[in-house]
């Protein structure tokens, strides 16, 4: 892989030392030329494809990076425990998805039947010529029709 990428990338790969770690992860310190600050610094921008190739090694004793072994065991997944990446949804089984789809179809069919019944009870003055009312129009016209019937009943009671 190093040979196909060219000499400029070989510096990056050699700083990782990915070929020489044949065994388990070992605790070792890695000198870091970068700041651990969340704000970007001027030095972090480089025209080089690899920051390690553009900068000189860090000789200060302040910031040191460590390998994977440094993390407490509570933060690492146990061997028998598989973790999904954050944001990944658990997939429903095909049977469960099919049942949910059938329930949703039945719910929509029941709603459509109820709206059709409401449309049949509305007088023709509320319907649009030749076109069935939409769901919202049906509900609004039904509310208006009920309020008109209520006013009519109240006026009869007063007389």
Curated annotation (Swiss-Prot):
Function text: Involved in specifying the paraxial, but not dorsal, mesoderm. May regulate the expression of T-box transcription factors required for mesoderm formation and differentiation.
Entry-linked InterPro entries: bHLH_dom (IPR011598), HLH_DNA-bd_sf (IPR036638), Mesogenin/MesP (IPR040259)
Record's GO cellular component terms: nucleus
This protein's UniProt keywords: Developmental protein, Differentiation, DNA-binding, Nucleus, Transcription, Transcription regulation
Example of a GO MF term: RNA polymerase II cis-regulatory region sequence-specific DNA binding
Ranges for region Disordered: 79-101
GO terms (BP aspect): cell differentiation; mesoderm formation; regulation of transcription by RNA polymerase II
Organism from which the protein derives: Gallus gallus
Protein name: Mesogenin-1
Xref: SMART domains: HLH
Keyword Amino-acid biosynthesis: no
Pfam entry (one): HLH
Disulfide-linked positions: none
UniProt feature, compositional bias: Basic residues: 86-100
Stretches assigned to the bHLH domain: 95-149
Localization of this protein: Nucleus
